[in-house]
Every structure is written in C-alpha cells, then in structure tokens.
Amino acid sequence: MNLTPKEIVKFLDDYVIGQKKAKKIIAIALRNRYRRMQLSPELQDDIVPKNILMIGSTGVGKTEIARRLAKMMGFPFIKIEASKYTEVGFVGRDVESMVRDLANAALNLVKNEQREKNKDKIDEFIENKILEKLLPPLPKGISDEKQEEYKNSLEKMRTKLRNGDLDESTIEIEISQNMFDTNPNLPPEMGAMQDIVKVIGVGSKKVKKEMKIKDAKNALKNEAGEKILDQESIKSEALKRAENEGIIFIDEIDKIAVSSGNSNRQDPSKEGVQRDLLPIVEGSNIQTKIGTLKTDHILFIAAGAFHLSKPSDLIPELQGRFPLRVELDSLDDKALYEILTRPKNSLLKQYSQLLKTENLELEFDDEAIKEIAKIASRANEEMQDIGARRLHTVIEKLLEDLSFEADEYAGKKFVVDKKMVEEKLGDIIENKDLARYIL
C-alpha cells in the first residue's frame, strides 16, 4: 500500500491518541521502504532501514502503533519479548527463533491472501470431498438413466450443502495429522525441529475422523490449500515479503540491559542475549522453513520502559543499530478521555456493543467519561503507571454489577452518569491500600 507519511499518521490517529513524534518517525521509516523499492537493485542493497527505539511506560501505545500499521499495510509482523530469550548454550529460546517466527507470519499472510483469491476453487474442492462421502461415485458400466439420476441427486445434495442444511450431519473424513501439532507440551525451542520434520514429512500420517459437516469444511481447508495453491510460489513470495517488508517488534528491551550501577545483581546471560541479537539486527542469513532469510532489510522496533535502566546500558554496538529514538508521552486525564471517546472502536463502544447483545442500551454521559478518565489517571499517578490499560480495570469495576444483572435490564436504556462513577469508584480510589488491589 502506497501511503505518504501524512496519510499514515492520519490513519494512526483513528486508533492511537497523541504520540505524534512516535507516529511521525514510524511513518517515515515505512515510507522509506517504498522509496527504497523504487531504486536500482544495486542501490537497494546498500540502503538499510533505520531501526527505532521507543521509550515509554506500558500502555502508552508503543505496540499498538506498530501492530496497526503492519496490519493496515499487509506487512509480516511479530511481537516478541526480549526477556524470553536466552544466550546460546543456555536452556530456552535462542534469538534466531524470532526470524523463524517472522517467516511463519509471512507464510501465513501470503497463504491467506492466496486462499482468498482462490476461494471458489477451494470451496469447490471441499464440496466435492464431502459429496464423495455423502454420495459415493457410481461404478463403471452403469446405464445412462442411472447416471442421470445420480447427477440430479448430486446437484440436489450440493445445493443443500451450500445452504447449510447438512451442517449438523456427521461424516467420516481422512485428514493429515502431524504429531508435533497435537503435542502442547513440546518446549518452544523445538520450533526448528518441527519445521524440519514437516518439510521431510516425518511424523505425518493420515487419520480418519468422524465429525459434523460444518467442522469437516474447516478441517479440509488446509488439504484444499495444499492441493490447489502453488506452494513453492507461496514460499518464494513469503520469503520476499519477510526480507523486504518484515517488522520485528522487540518489547522489554530494557529487561536485557545491564545497569552499570547494579551490575553485580544482573543476570550474566543478559549481555549474551544482546550479543546474540546483534548479528540478526546487523544482517545475517537464517535458515527457515521458507528458505534462507536475509535479515538486512527487516525493520526492528525495540521498546522498553527503562525504569530501572537507561538506553545507554545496552551494549554500544546494539545502541548503534537503533539510531532513531523516540520517547512516548505518559497519558494524563485529557489523553485518557480522548482514548475513551475518539478511536473508532473505543473501549466504551465495545462495552456498549457487548451489552447490546443482552438487549440493553448502554450510554455514558460526558461528565461520567471525564470522571472515569480522572480516576484512571489518579490511579496511574499513585500506583504503577500502566497507561491506557488502567481504563480496562476501572470500567470493569464500574460495570461489574450491571454486567452481572444485564438480563434484568433487557429492553431498557441505562445511562452511566458522574454520580454513579463516584458511588462505585470514589471510596476505592480514596483508600490507597484498597485501590492497589482493585484498580
């Protein structure tokens, strides 16, 4: 999608309140990708993305900015926590697995696009598979009259299948099953091994299962995709997308920084994780299920609160790989008020729509919204600052009784006013000890 930086920021304004500096920097970084692709191949190789370091408390919009943009522009995107990785030689996930995760995200993205383009062919394949079970093909040598009867019965059955009239009927189908897909107890570091065995086919077998037709339609989608879609071209496109459009969002980067003033209490493997991360951010070749993936042009966005450490506590080489830095603003009561009212699918709209399913019309008057924002802001100031996430806790507590008794208000309109907010939350916010547990 070809959008100018101004258009990108305008799109983000519908979902993320404030944070103009962060939006501007990311918009420019994404536009530079488009600009790079317009150049000669020789020059493209020399232009590497300027990685971004976002500094700010939790809940201020760091992840949301990157996630929204990636989804809107159709870019492969993954979010990982730096603190979940371990140095090579230690038990746990190694940093290369984040690149394999990005490859999987790109593969799923391209597969879904191709499935949508070939939806009619896939639906027809699934229909024919199910119809074969419902009405087995006639043997050879059958009279023309019998063949015509069979054809008519088949079309009637096809119509019923498409209309959903047979959804509750049960059939037995044969589907492929991989032993790794069905074992939830495998450790995450087995990811590479899973990729290998899937490629060579070890551990895969056909199993027969009885299920309702509506479930069989979903179960046969993968098989339909494997048969109809060109798997090699999908892998090739996914590799290209991951290399040139991929975004890896590394959260909690501050958790692997080694504070100089408190070095004796640090985990010695933290610096090791940084050093393992360095070649990936600099550019290296990683083996994945879709081929060898070059990380040179992946955009890395690192983020952290940096309450107990500073960006300068990261190793110098890694600092140099994140040249663009932006500090995100904390959210005051005015910003929280805008978060409750401005976004397309604001939190208040979500709650109203949820209760609408109970035939209850829920409204918030303006003074009530301002009071909710003030209480959330005060809770953030007096306790740990968790940004906009505090609004979820405050509104859940405010609407707890109404949600529980929603059926009693069916067919009615319920207006939340300032008085109700004060009655439900006033005593809690005044009692600091109680507020720490509830809000």
UniProtKB/Swiss-Prot annotation:
Cellular localisation: Cytoplasm
Annotated keywords? ATP-binding, Chaperone, Cytoplasm, Nucleotide-binding, Stress response
* Domain of life where this protein originates: Bacteria
Q: What does this protein do?
A: ATPase subunit of a proteasome-like degradation complex; this subunit has chaperone activity. The binding of ATP and its subsequent hydrolysis by HslU are essential for unfolding of protein substrates subsequently hydrolyzed by HslV. HslU recognizes the N-terminal part of its protein substrates and unfolds these before they are guided to HslV for hydrolysis.
Gene Ontology MF terms in the entry? ATP binding; ATP hydrolysis activity; peptidase activity; proteasome-activating activity
Provide the binding site for ATP. 17, 59-64, 251, 317, 389
- Kindly give the Gene3D superfamilies that the UniProt entry links to this protein: 1.10.8.60, P-loop containing nucleotide triphosphate hydrolases
> Which Pfam families is this protein grouped with?
AAA, AAA_2, ClpB_D2-small
Q: What is this protein called?
A: ATP-dependent protease ATPase subunit HslU
Gene Ontology CC: one annotated term: HslUV protease complex
First and last residue of the signal peptide = none
According to the record's subunit comment, the protein's assembly and interactions are: A double ring-shaped homohexamer of HslV is capped on each side by a ring-shaped HslU homohexamer. The assembly of the HslU/HslV complex is dependent on binding of ATP.
- Is Cytoplasm tagged as a keyword? yes
The record's annotation in InterPro entries points to: AAA+_ATPase, ATP-dep_Clp_protease_ClpX, ATPase_AAA_core, Clp_ATPase_C, HslU, P-loop_NTPase
The similarity annotation says: Belongs to the ClpX chaperone family. HslU subfamily.
Gene Ontology biological-process entries? protein unfolding; proteolysis involved in protein catabolic process
Which gene codes for it?
hslU
